[in-house]
């Protein structure tokens, strides 16, 4: 189900913009996207959470993860960092992968901006796909619903951290 707090807008032929505002400081939201232990608590929809994750945060480094479905099926993903501006911006090449981290084309580029709104943080996640067909394929796989549910889990994680 898509939470109305999360907006998803196809742009141009190859882009998808997903936005969500969180009641947490920008530094904490950025850490949630870049620290392994935090990612393990929220990445993926509730029915496809990650159960394995490594993070090598640095340009040229990668995060590699496994999502596990309700019947035990698995899906692997990998992001190779291209740009890191602490607490402000992440850019990475986004791929499906295998368990060894071998990238499976086509590549998409994820540009994630963390916008300070004076006590809240807007996450602006723009994905640029290799082609319009690639975007349509990923949309057909339910990426909008999955990211909305994932953002709900991030919201819950941030609230739990704030509550101590």
Model-predicted segments: where are they?
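A generic structural micro-feature
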Residues: 10-12, 57, 71-75, 102-106, ...
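Intrinsic-disorder/low-complexity, polar/charged segments enriched in Ser/Thr/Lys/Arg/Asp/Glu/Gln
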Residues: 13-19, 26, 50, 62, ...
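Glycine-rich portal/gate segments that line the openings of hydrophobic small-molecule binding cavities
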Residues: 51-95
